[in-house]
């Protein structure tokens, strides 16, 4: 991973410099856009963009239909991780320990009722850049996941939110606990947590 980072460092610096002009133009245009929104909706309450700051959003766990005859379920499982495994692509290499746990179905208390291991889920929460790592709570205030991305259709959400298409991608807390407990063997950390089932 370190060698990979070093190999792209120069190119990343070049791209960052090349994007600087675009970013400046976008920031100026966005300022005018927000000014226009505030003027147009001056009688209504306005909410700020997250722009890498704290923000509260809400939604529901939900799949979506990005186009005709295509439906993405709201839940992914470890089955999907194994289906995507590719030993020639570092992003899709599955560690032997995780494979062994999967083959043995050794998911402990973290598995779904049907015996599968949950990995991630999608929700209608409206997120933006800087929201990765944000806690995701249920209606009882219990941690159920950690936001880490948004779907491809959600990238334009900084301009306009489209509830039928945009989804936050959230790692299921049961998968995180499974990795801590079964994969990493660090179950002692769980003693510091209050787990609710």
Short names for language-model regions:
Residues 1-197:
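Terminal presequence/propeptide segments associated with secretion/organelle targeting
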């Amino acid at each position: 991973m370190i060698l990979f980072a070093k190999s792209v460092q120069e190119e990343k610096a070049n791209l960052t410099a090349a994007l600087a002009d675009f970013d400046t133009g976008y920031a100026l245009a966005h300022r005018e856009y927000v000014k226009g929104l505030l003027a147009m909706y001056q009688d209504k309450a306005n909410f700020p963009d997250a722009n890498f700051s704290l923000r509260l959003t809400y939604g529901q766990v939900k799949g979506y239909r990005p186009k005709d005859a295509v439906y993405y379920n709201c839940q992914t499982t470890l089955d999907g991780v194994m289906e995507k495994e590719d030993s020639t692509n570092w992003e899709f290499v599955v560690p032997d320990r995780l494979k062994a746990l999967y083959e043995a179905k050794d998911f402990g208390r973290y598995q779904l009722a049907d015996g599968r291991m949950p990995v991630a889920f999608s929700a209608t929460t409206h997120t933006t850049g800087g929201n990765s790592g944000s806690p995701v709570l249920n209606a009882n205030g219990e941690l159920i996941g950690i936001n880490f991305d948004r779907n491809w259709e959600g990238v334009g959400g900084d301009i306009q939110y489209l509830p039928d298409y945009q989804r936050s991608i959230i790692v299921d807390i049961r998968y995180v606990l499974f990795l801590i407990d079964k994969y990493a063997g660090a179950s002692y950390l769980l003693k510091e947590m209050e787990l609710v089932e």
